[in-house]
Structures are given as C-alpha cells and as structure tokens.
C-alpha cells in the first residue's frame, strides 16, 4: 500500500531541497527544533508574527510601479503553488511512514508475546536446576572431606611414581638425546629429592639422578666444544648448562671462544680475498708497464688516465657485501644469542646476587670491540686499494651498506663504540676520496698541458695561428688531422676539458650527500664535508694548483726562457685571466648550489681566488714579454757583436737580422692578437714611417753631424743630448704589461731596442758602420711604430741607438736621408 501511494518524484536530492525550504520557512534547525531568533516587529515582514497585509500592500503600491506589482504577484503565486505542492508531497510521505510504523508496532507486539512465553519456560527450568543442585550438595555434605583426602593421596602417589620412575625416564631421554626434557624433569624433582635426601629410598633415587645428569652435562659440554654445532644448538646447550648450575663466567668464556672461532674464519676469508686482490692488481700493473706500442701520455689514454679504476679481482661492493653478510650478520647473531642467554635471561634468586648480566655485558663489549677492530682494519685496507676514481658509485654504495649494517649493532648493543668507529671510517674514506680526486685533477691538468705542448712543439704556429696536429684528446678528433688547432681552439679545448672534468668530479663526489645514502645525514657530511672537503679541499685547492703550477713556468725558466714554449705562456696567461673574470665565480657558485654549502667555517672568498688568478695571469704575461723580448734581443746582440763595424763596407741593403726582427714581431703580433684584444693606441701621425728619420736629421743631429765638425762639436752635441734626455719621458723597460696586444708588443719592442742600444754603446763604429746603423734603424722604424701604443717610444729609442752609434763613431759622417729611404724601400 505504501508503495502504491508513494509519489513519483522520490529523488533524495529533491526531497532534501524541499525539507530545507520548509525548515527555513518554519524556522527549524537540522534537529527539528525551532531556532531562537529575535521576533521581528516589522509589520511589512511577511515572515514575521506581526505582519499586517494592509500596510504591506500600501507600501508596495507606493514604492512599486504597476509592472513591478504584477511581477511581484506572479512571483508570490509561484511560491504559494510550490509550497502547496511541497506540503502535499510531505503529507503523502508522512502518511506512508505512519502506515509503516503501525505495521512495525503490530509485529513487535506479536514478537514480545512469544518472548514472554519463552522467558516463563526458562524461569521454570532454572528453578528446577537450582533445586536439584541443592539436593546433590546435601547428599555429598558428609563425604566431602573423605573425597578431598582421597584426591590428595592420589596426587601424592602420582608424584611418588614420578620420582621412582625418574632415573629410568632420565636414561631414556639421554639415549634419545632429549636433553631439554631430561633437564626439565630433573628440575621438577630436584627440590623434593633434596628435601627428603635423609631417607634411604629417596637418597638412592637422588644418587642415580645425579650420575645420569652428570653424564648428560658431560655430553652437553662435549657438544658445546664441538665446532660443528649450529647457533641454535649452541644456545640450547648453554641454556641447559646454566640450568644445571654450571659457572656462568666459564660458560660466557666458552660461548665467546666458540663464536670467535667462527668469526675468525669469516675474517680470514676476507683477508684471503684482500691478498688475492693485491696479486691481481700487481699482475695487471705489470702488464700495463710492458705493453708495447702504448700511446703517448694523454687524458684520453687508458694507461695513464687517473680517472680509470684499476683492475681488481673483486670490487669493493662485493667485498663489503661479503663482510656484512658473513661477519657482521654472524656477529649480530652472536650478540643476540649471548644477550638472550646471559644478559636478558631472568635470574633466579640464587643467581641474581652474582651480577651475571654486568659481568657478561663487559665480556661482550670487549669481545665485540676486538673483532670489530680487526674487521675495520680489513675494510680500511680494501678502501685504500680503491686508487682509481673512475666509478665512485661503487665505493659510495659499499660505504653506505657498511654503515647501514653497523647500525644493527648499535641497536643490539647500546653504548658500543663500533657504529661510531664505522662512521669514522666512512668519513676518512670520503676525505681520502677527495684527495684522490684532487690528485687526479692535478694529473689530468698536467697531462692536458702535455698535449698542448705537443701541439705547440709540432710545426710551429703560423701567423694564422694554426699548428700541426699534436697528440692527445685536446687536439681533437678526425678533423684535427686536416685542420690543426689554433691557439684559441687550444685554449677553448683546454678550458672546456678542465671544466667538464671538474664537473664530472663534483657529480661523483655529490654521491656522498645523496638523500638515499644513510650516512649523508651525519653532521660531517652536511657541514664540514661540503665546505672544507669539497669546496676548500677540492675546488679551491685545484684552482690554486692551476695558478701555482702556471706560475712555476715563470720561476723554473732561466734567462733565456727555458724549454717552455712562449705560446704556452701566452695561452696560460689567458686561461688564468678567464678564470679571474668568470670561471672561478661560476665554479664556486655551482659548488655552493650543488652541495648547499653553509659558510659557518671560514672559507676562501671568491675575490681572493680571482686576485690570485689575475696575479698568475699577470706574471705569465710579463714573463712572455720578457722571453719574447730576450729572443729578439739575442738575435740583435749577436748581430752587433759578431760584426766588424770599423772596417765594414758601405751599406747597400738592410741587414737580414732586421728583417727577421720585423718578421718575428709581426708573428708575435698575430699570435697575441688571437688571445687578447687590440688595446688603446695614441693617435699616430700620417707619416710615421718617415717622421722618425726626420728626427735623425733634425737640428740637433745637424749640429752633431754637420760638415763643419770641429773638436768642440762633440762637447756641444753631448750637452744638447743630455739636455734632451732630461726633458724626455722616462722609459721603464720591464714595466708591468696590460692585458692587450698593444701593451704586450710595446713591452717586447722596448726590451729588444733597449738591448740593441746597450750593445751599440759597447762597440766602436766606422763611417760605414754608422751608416748601416742608420739604415737598420730606419727600417725598424718603418714597421715597428705600428705595433706600439706610442710611436714616440720607438722614435726615442731608435734615436738613442743612432746617437750612441754616432758617439762611438771614429768618422761620424751620416748618410743622406733620401739614400736611406731608397735602401729601406728596396729592402
């Protein structure tokens, strides 16, 4: 019936919406109670109790237009219809619920009637049971004491039977090797036999049991001494012997001695593996040394590359796995068994006073520390064999596994120093790894410079900056055979190789601080390892090494430049300058971001490293200028010292050495221009190549070399020359060089011309010797002025050379300027 009267619109969401609207209308909350709201006194509030329809209608007529009134009427009609529909729906629903509730109440009445009948029946049965129980208790009241006595006698007889059968039972257990059952049976009867030992029958049983238990104890001791017993059997033996009142201290020593023999076997296996690995390494090393046709030393060569791991029979991860799975696991099992037997075992009253747990705990600590020290020494020996730094992940994973497995000992044996000692081994391994990486980077840098030197030692760099192909990875691949690398290419390759190798090293070292590594959350790896280890010990040390090793090329070279190619000095100076401008900041920023370096401890600032790199670059560039200047000076000195300037013939050509000087200077200009910017020059005159020689024929030199040359003329010319020097600008020959091409060439030319000047001052010239010097100086002036920052510098030095030659000339008759120009143009 209820289903027939249910309206078709029975959607739960629709019903909830209707209920909420009605509750809102009647002012009810969710629990169906009227909400306590302040009554509205507004007669225009249609929902208020004081609503006055007349006032409300008058207000609407005043405030609203006809259209608004009609709309308001339509809205109210819709609301009334909606509420009417909702009310009908609720009436239908409540009617159905009322009918359903009536049916439910009718069913409950029928059920309760049946339940009352069953309860009456149960009450009658309980009364009958109570009456029957009272009747039985009354009947047995007189025989209760007799039954209790008979039960006690029966129990005593069973105990006596157990005592009389005990020797046979113990012998049977001894034959079946059921030692635990025998000990348990004897412990149950021991107190009774001891109490009634004065009775002959019990005394005999006690003696027989004592003999049998002595045999059992002897077998347990023998089983305890045998090395083939498992850990479970060993623990059972110890527990049974303790129950047989064996001395606890002696049992501790025997247990640890037996366990030590097994652990010693594990350590000997690890040590044998170390020896096999050492033999394998020695054999592999001898093969490498004697291998024929090995490639030249280069970073890409597998023979000398420090980033390749040496061949070994077993890698370190397998070694650590074996140590953890065998030694550490067995040690943890021994600790757990020992603690369960001697330390955590409940002590009986007579044993509690002997402080067995304290004694056993002390012996256990000594035992664990001794064996762990031997194990740690083997682990450190194996870590030290990891000389190659090619694959750092194996070492980090091995150290992580080593550290992780040692944490089990800290849980089993609180207060043990073994876990902290293991952490110290990991820390030392990380420090040693950083040193190895630093050494490998240094070796790689030296090998890279060897490649550069080989590339420079092949057919020398032409004026275009190209050279023949050299060996090693820096020279390039197959394309390098057709197009030898230029200085910029060598610089770029060297810089990229160093930077990429350093990034690779940082990525390898970063494995020590990975989130999945257990020891990475230790304070050392969060602080000191990142700041002092990686940043200072690796990155900063490597940058300082680059600067220091570069400066050594200046210190080791002699006055003639040693064996270091000048192009290498120039390239290294540019490399250090690039480090000062950008590379150092980039590397340190990368390191700080990658390792989250916390600058709690003093670290080297970027500015200090940049200053050191700039100092190295300045020193290298100064030395390059000095070396190149001395090379040209050597040619000029030999050309002056090996010539007879008094008896020479009349000059017809420019000397070949002057042409060589100009050619070498031009080559140096191109070479320096490949790596450094042009620089700033002073404004040049349009006739610089000629104006210099006009200085030679100036009024001062006309006074010097006039045909009316008299003995007093040298005094006048000397005076004028000295006065001219007083007012001329001082020239510093070995002044610091700026990082540009013009400054470098200026320094080289100053050294060369100054040497030329000093050599001229030491020689004596004839007439044609002076004229040859004039021709040579004019030729130099025609070409050298364009290389320097200030052409007046060249004018002054060449003027000094000609003037010194005139002072040292026996017959100072200068050549006509036009003749000099013709000879130089023809030359």
From Swiss-Prot:
The family this protein is said to belong to: Belongs to the VPS51 family.
Role of this protein: Involved in retrograde transport from early and late endosomes to the late Golgi. The GARP complex is required for the maintenance of protein retrieval from endosomes to the TGN, acid hydrolase sorting, lysosome function, endosomal cholesterol traffic and autophagy. Acts as a component of the EARP complex that is involved in endocytic recycling.
Keywords, alphabetical: Coiled coil, Endosome, Golgi apparatus, Lipid transport, Protein transport, Transport
Entry's Gene Ontology BP terms: endocytic recycling; Golgi organization; Golgi vesicle transport; lipid digestion; lipid transport; lysosomal transport; protein transport; retrograde transport, endosome to Golgi
InterPro entries linked to this entry: Cullin_repeat-like_dom_sf, Vps51
GO CC, alphabetical: cytosol; EARP complex; GARP complex; membrane; recycling endosome
Biased composition (Low complexity): 291-304
Expression sites (tissue/organ): Ubiquitously expressed in adult.
Extent of Polar residues compositional bias: 279-290
Chaperone found in the keyword field: no
Residue ranges that the Swiss-Prot or TrEMBL entry lists as coiled coil: 99-131, 254-278
Pfam family, one: VPS51_Exo84_N
Protein name per Swiss-Prot or TrEMBL: Vacuolar protein sorting-associated protein 51 homolog
Annotated source species: Danio rerio (Zebrafish)
Summary of the knockout phenotype: Larvae are morphologically indistinguishable from wild-type sibling larvae, but their absorption of lipids is severely impaired.
Keyword Protein transport: yes
Localization annotation: Golgi apparatus, trans-Golgi network; Recycling endosome
Primary localization: Golgi
Domain of life: Eukaryota
GO-annotated molecular function: small GTPase binding
Location of region: Disordered: 279-304
Residues passing through the membrane, by range: none
């Amino acid at each position: 019936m209820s289903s027939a009267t249910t309206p078709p619109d029975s959607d739960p969401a629709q019903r909830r919406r209707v209920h909420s609207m009605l509750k809102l209308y009647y002012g009810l909350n969710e629990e169906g109670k009227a909400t306590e709201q302040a009554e509205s006194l507004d007669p225009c509030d249609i929902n208020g109790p004081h609503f006055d329809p007349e006032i409300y209608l008058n207000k609407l007529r005043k405030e609203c237009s006809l259209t608004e009134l009609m709309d308001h009427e339509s809205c109210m009609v819709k609301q009334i219809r909606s509420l009417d529909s909702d009310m009908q729906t609720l009436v239908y629903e409540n009617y159905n619920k009322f009918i359903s509730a009536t049916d439910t109440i009718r069913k409950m009445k029928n059920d309760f009637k049946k339940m009352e009948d069953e309860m009456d029946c149960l009450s009658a049965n309980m009364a009958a049971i109570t009456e029957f129980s009272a009747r039985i208790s009354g009947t047995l009241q007189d025989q209760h004491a007799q039954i209790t006595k008979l039960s006690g006698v029966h129990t005593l007889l069973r105990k006596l039977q157990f005592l009389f059968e005990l020797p046979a039972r113990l012998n049977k257990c001894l034959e079946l090797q059921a030692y635990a059952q025998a000990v348990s049976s004897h412990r149950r009867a021991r107190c009774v036999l001891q109490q009634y030992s004065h009775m002959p029958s019990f005394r005999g049983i006690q003696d027989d049991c004592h003999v049998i238990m002595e045999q059992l104890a002897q077998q347990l001791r023998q089983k305890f001494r045998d090395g083939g017993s498992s850990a479970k059997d060993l623990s059972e033996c110890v527990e049974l012997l303790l129950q047989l009142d064996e001395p606890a201290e002696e049992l501790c020593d025997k247990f640890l001695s037996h366990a030590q023999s097994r652990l010693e076997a594990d350590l000997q296996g690890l040590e044998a593996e170390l020896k096999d690995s050492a033999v394998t390494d020695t054999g592999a090393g001898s093969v490498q040394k004697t291998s024929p046709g090995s490639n030249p030393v280069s970073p890409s060569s597998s023979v000398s590359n420090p980033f390749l791991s040496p061949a070994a029979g077993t890698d370190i991860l397998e070694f650590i796995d074996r140590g953890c799975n065998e030694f550490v696991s067995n040690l943890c099992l021994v600790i757990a068994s020992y603690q369960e037997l001697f330390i955590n075992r409940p002590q009986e009253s007579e044993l509690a006073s002997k402080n067995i747990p304290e004694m056993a705990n002390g012996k256990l600590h000594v035992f664990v520390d001794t064996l762990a020290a031997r194990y740690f020494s083997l682990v450190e020996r194996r870590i030290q064999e990891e000389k190659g730094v090619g694959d750092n992940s194996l070492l980090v994973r091995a150290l992580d596994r080593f550290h992780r497995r040692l944490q089990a000992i800290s849980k089993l044996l609180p207060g043990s120093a073994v876990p902290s000692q293991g952490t110290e081994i990991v820390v030392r391994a990380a420090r040693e790894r950083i040193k190895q990486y630093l050494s490998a980077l240094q070796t790689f840098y030296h090998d890279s410079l060897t490649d550069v030197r080989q590339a420079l030692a092949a057919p020398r760099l032409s004026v275009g900056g190209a050279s023949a192909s050299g060996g090693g990875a820096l020279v390039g691949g197959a394309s390098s055979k057709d197009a030898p690398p230029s200085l910029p290419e060598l610089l770029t390759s060297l810089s990229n190789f160093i930077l990429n190798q350093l990034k690779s090293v940082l990525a390898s070292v970063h494995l020590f601080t990975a989130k999945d590594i257990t020891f990475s959350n230790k304070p050392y790896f969060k602080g000191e390892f990142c700041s002092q280890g990686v940043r200072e010990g690796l990155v900063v040390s490597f940058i300082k090494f680059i600067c220091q090793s570069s400066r050594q090329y200046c210190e080791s070279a002699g006055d003639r430049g040693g064996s270091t190619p000048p192009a290498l000095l120039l390239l290294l100076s540019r490399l250090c300058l690039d480090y000062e401008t950008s590379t150092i900041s980039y590397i340190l920023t990368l390191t700080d971001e990658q390792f989250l370096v916390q600058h709690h401890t003093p670290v080297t600032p970027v500015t200090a490293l940049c200053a050191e790199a700039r100092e190295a670059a300045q020193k290298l560039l100064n030395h390059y200028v000095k070396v190149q200047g001395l090379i040209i000076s050597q040619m000029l000195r030999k050309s002056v010292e090996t010539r007879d300037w008094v008896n020479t013939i009349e000059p017809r050509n420019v000397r070949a050495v002057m042409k060589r000087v100009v050619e070498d200077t031009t080559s140096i200009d191109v070479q320096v221009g490949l790596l450094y910017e042009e620089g700033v020059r002073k404004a040049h005159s349009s006739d610089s190549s000629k104006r210099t020689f006009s200085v030679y024929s100036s009024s001062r030199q006309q006074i010097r070399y006039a045909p009316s040359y008299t003995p007093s003329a040298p005094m006048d010319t000397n005076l004028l020359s000295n006065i001219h020097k007083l007012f001329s600008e001082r020239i510093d020959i070995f002044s610091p060089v700026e990082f540009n091409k013009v400054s470098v060439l200026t320094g080289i030319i100053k050294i060369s011309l100054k040497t030329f000047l000093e050599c001229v001052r030491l020689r004596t010239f004839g007439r044609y010797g002076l004229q040859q010097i004039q021709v040579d100086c004019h030729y130099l002036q025609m070409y050298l002025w364009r290389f320097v920052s200030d052409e007046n510098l060249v004018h002054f030095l060449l003027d000094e050379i000609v003037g010194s030659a005139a002072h040292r000339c026996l017959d100072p008759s200068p050549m006509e300027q036009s003749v000099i120009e013709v000879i130089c143009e023809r030359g």
